[in-house]
Amino acid sequence: MMAEEHTDLEAQIVKDIHFKEIDLVNRDPKNINEDIVKVDFEDVIAEPVGTYSFDGVWKVSYTTFTVSKYWCYRLLSTLLGVPLALLWGFLFACISFCHIWAVVPCIKSYLIEIQCISHIYSLCIRTFCNPLFAALGQVCSNIKVMLRKEV
């Protein structure tokens, strides 16, 4: 009985990961498009002082821009949204797969192999460079500099 409840709970957790509720009101909860895609009429078209068009033209232009942008986006998202979501899902799945099964193991392998080399390198530095720089430090420690200001 207890094992069945545990299995049901695991199945529920897996189901929740793949079928979570999405927010239809706030569709950018992490604000990834805050400054990039938000383009309004005033961001694109502006008339400097002294070169104004007729008020009616300005109002119709504003309405035309806003409505055409709105409906063009809706049309494009209707036609291309699902295929592009499929494409991006596939692409990020491939990237995740490569990262999990190729990149991380290569990095771990490299770190294991480089550890042996780093010990040898450290030994060489301590054996050859440390005495050399210590001797140079002793030689240069007796150098005295006097500054004299001549008037």
Swiss-Prot record:
Topology feature Cytoplasmic, residues: 1-83, 105-151
A GO molecular-function annotation: protein-containing complex binding
Cross-link (Glycyl lysine isopeptide (Lys-Gly) (interchain with G-Cter in SUMO3)) at residue(s): 38
Keyword annotations from UniProtKB, A to Z: Cell membrane, Golgi apparatus, Isopeptide bond, Membrane, Ubl conjugation
Principal cellular location given in the protein's record: Golgi
Intramembrane segment ranges: 84-104
Classification via InterPro entries: Caveolin (IPR001612), Caveolin_CS (IPR018361)
Keyword Cell membrane in record: yes
GO CC field: caveola; dystrophin-associated glycoprotein complex; endoplasmic reticulum; Golgi membrane; sarcolemma; T-tubule
Region (Required for interaction with DAG1): 64-114
Family, per entry: Belongs to the caveolin family.
Stated role: May act as a scaffolding protein within caveolar membranes. Interacts directly with G-protein alpha subunits and can functionally regulate their activity. May also regulate voltage-gated potassium channels. Plays a role in the sarcolemma repair mechanism of both skeletal muscle and cardiomyocytes that permits rapid resealing of membranes disrupted by mechanical stress. Mediates the recruitment of CAVIN2 and CAVIN3 proteins to the caveolae.
The protein's assembly and partners: Homooligomer. Interacts with DYSF. Interacts with DLG1 and KCNA5; forms a ternary complex. Interacts with DAG1 (via its C-terminal); the interaction prevents binding of DAG1 with DMD. Interacts with TRIM72. Interacts with MUSK; may regulate MUSK signaling. Interacts with POPDC1. Interacts with CAVIN1, CAVIN2 and CAVIN4.
Protein name: Caveolin-3
Gene source species: Bos taurus
